[in-house]
């Protein structure tokens, strides 16, 4: 039988899912706060591939991959006030760096696919 994360609920109602001692949940947030803040973790690291890994009820959102701020299809930090910040592998970059990163990645993939 496959190990499933164990749910623990704190006295304030915060829900935590643990697997092997680490915050971990593959099918949803590993931490859910009563105020609707949510955080996604895999093996103890903030991680989510299909959306922000941290969503605050205030509207702020943060994208993480393997514990690092990282997003190649937009800003890694989006704030309620409209401000945005771009990160690649936990390094703050300019928006155009993300655009260039994407072009380079696409070109590389096309090169690999089209090799004979």
Describe each PLM feature range.
Residues 1-116:
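Glycine/tyrosine- and acidic-biased, solvent-exposed loop/turn segments at the edges of beta-strands
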């Amino acid at each position: 039988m496959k190990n499933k994360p164990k749910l623990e609920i704190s006295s304030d109602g915060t829900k935590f899912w643990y697997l092997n001692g680490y915050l971990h949940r593959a099918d949803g947030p590993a931490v859910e706060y009563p105020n609707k803040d949510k955080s996604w973790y895999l093996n103890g690291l903030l991680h989510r591939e299909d959306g922000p890994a941290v969503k605050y009820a205030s509207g702020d959102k943060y994208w993480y991959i393997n514990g690092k701020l990282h997003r190649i299809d937009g800003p890694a930090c989006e704030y309620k006030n409209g401000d945005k910040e771009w990160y690649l592998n936990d390094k703050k970059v300019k928006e155009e760096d993300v655009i260039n990163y994407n072009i380079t990645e696409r070109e590389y993939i096309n090169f690999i696919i089209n090799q004979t």
